[in-house]
């Protein structure tokens, strides 16, 4: 594989899938599979760490698949931050572009996600501060690269025993309507403007999700468990009140404006009455996150400086990302072109320097 010393690969069948990986990865054990690939845990004999090896499923099956494969690889390669999942290795058993059909990505093996944590224990306010601080610290970094997560929810937040958190699966979500229909967690954390196509959305769709997650950590229950889009919006407005005229008039969608105007007026509730017993600083922050008007919603950077995080906030240790070139998003290339670009990204991958201080879960 060009300038890299090519390792020795070995083959093994797991769950009716052939895995072909470098010898440094041993003890492969299936941990799950989804639409876009299967994941095994493995021991990385080089670092001594348990890692997650993901084999992408039919990465170049269609133009959409091929572009998504390229997107995932580019995003993961770019992310170098303690609170964001990054890439430890990328490889393919192929020795040339002509034989390049499989892509494998290696990341840290994350133990629990925030869902497990919430179910198991009532969190103290200090726990909530630390967890939400880390989400916002990761988001500041992601947003500074002009990347929007779009699908932040408890299952996309990995947490280890020390309460250290990493954001997973960002920037990939281009969710279809079917995936958002019905009583689904995917939608419960979604900002109303993205769920209902109100208008062009911005980075703060992720802040809305953080507000929903933070409320859930404080109360132990889902904030807006809507049964469908309409019920979800009703639950949201019971808290936020109906959108002000100034916001409705800025919605490009005629349908959206008509629908909102047809709703009976609802006043905004006093958040202190809803989150009884919560730290007043936490309530104040929630009020700034769960705002219908995206122009008035707090940003990740601003939220980090909120007094609620006084014991964690350190402006010198909340880094931003290098610029991320995503001009490829507007390109319509054929499968072979996306494949060639992906191949180049795989062979040019430089593994991170292991500092011995990485989080194990």
UniProtKB/Swiss-Prot annotation:
GO molecular function, a single term: protein serine kinase activity
InterPro entries tied to this protein: Kinase-like_dom_sf, MAP_kinase, MAP_kinase_CS, MAPK_p38-like, Prot_kinase_dom, Protein_kinase_ATP_BS
Q: Identify the main location.
A: cytoplasm
Q: Which positions does the record annotate as the modified residue Phosphothreonine? A: 181
| Annotated localization | Cytoplasm; Nucleus
Q: Quote the record's binding site residues for ATP.
A: 31-39, 54
Q: Where is this motif: TXY?
A: 181-183
Q: Which reaction equation describes what this protein catalyses?
A: L-seryl-[protein] + ATP = O-phospho-L-seryl-[protein] + ADP + H(+); L-threonyl-[protein] + ATP = O-phospho-L-threonyl-[protein] + ADP + H(+)
Task: State its cofactor.
Answer: Mg(2+)
Q: Which residues form the Protein kinase domain?
A: 25-309
GO CC, alphabetical: cytoplasm; nucleus
Q: What is its EC number?
A: 2.7.11.24
User: In which family does this protein belong, per the annotation?
Assistant: Belongs to the protein kinase superfamily. CMGC Ser/Thr protein kinase family. MAP kinase subfamily.
PANTHER family, per this entry? MITOGEN-ACTIVATED PROTEIN KINASE
Q: What is this protein called?
A: Mitogen-activated protein kinase 14B
Organism, as annotated: Cyprinus carpio (Common carp)
**Encoding gene per record:** mapk14b
């Amino acid at each position: 594989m060009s300038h890299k010393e090519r390792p020795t690969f070995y083959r093994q069948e797991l769950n009716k899938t052939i895995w072909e990986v470098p010898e440094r990865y041993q003890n492969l054990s299936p941990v799950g599979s989804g639409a876009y690939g299967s994941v095994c845990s493995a021991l990385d004999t080089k670092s001594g760490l348990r890692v997650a090896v993901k084999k992408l499923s039919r990465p170049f099956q269609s133009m959409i698949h091929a572009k998504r494969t390229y997107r995932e690889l580019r995003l993961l390669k770019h992310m170098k931050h303690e609170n964001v999942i990054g890439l430890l290795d990328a490889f393919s058993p192929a020795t040339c572009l002509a034989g390049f059909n499989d892509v494998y990505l290696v990341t840290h093996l994350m133990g629990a996600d925030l869902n497990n944590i919430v179910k198991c224990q009532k969190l103290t306010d200090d726990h909530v501060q630390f967890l939400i601080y880390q989400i916002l610290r990761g988001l500041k970094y992601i947003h500074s690269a002009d990347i929007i997560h779009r699908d932040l929810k408890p299952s996309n937040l990995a947490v280890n025993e020390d309460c250290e958190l990493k954001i997973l699966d960002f920037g990939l979500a281009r969710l279809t309507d079917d995936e958002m229909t019905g009583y689904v967690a995917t939608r419960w954390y979604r900002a109303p403007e993205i769920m209902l196509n109100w208008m062009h959305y911005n980075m703060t769709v992720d802040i809305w999700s953080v507000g929903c997650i933070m409320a859930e950590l404080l109360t132990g229950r889902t904030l807006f468990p809507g049964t469908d889009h309409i019920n979800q919006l009703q639950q949201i407005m019971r808290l936020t009140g109906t959108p002000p005229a100034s916001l409705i008039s800025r919605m490009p969608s005629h349908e959206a404006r008509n629908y909102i105007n047809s709703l009976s007026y609802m006043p905004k509730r006093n958040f202190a009455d809803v989150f009884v017993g919560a730290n007043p600083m936490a309530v104040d922050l929630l009020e700034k996150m769960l705002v219908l008007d995206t122009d008035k919603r707090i940003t990740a950077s601003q939220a980090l400086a909120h007094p609620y995080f006084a014991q964690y906030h350190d402006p010198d240790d909340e880094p931003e990302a290098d610029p991320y070139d995503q001009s490829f998003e507007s390109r319509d290339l054929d499968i072979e072109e996306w494949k060639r670009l992906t191949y180049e990204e795989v062979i040019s991958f430089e593994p991170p320097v292991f500092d011995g201080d990485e989080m194990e879960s």
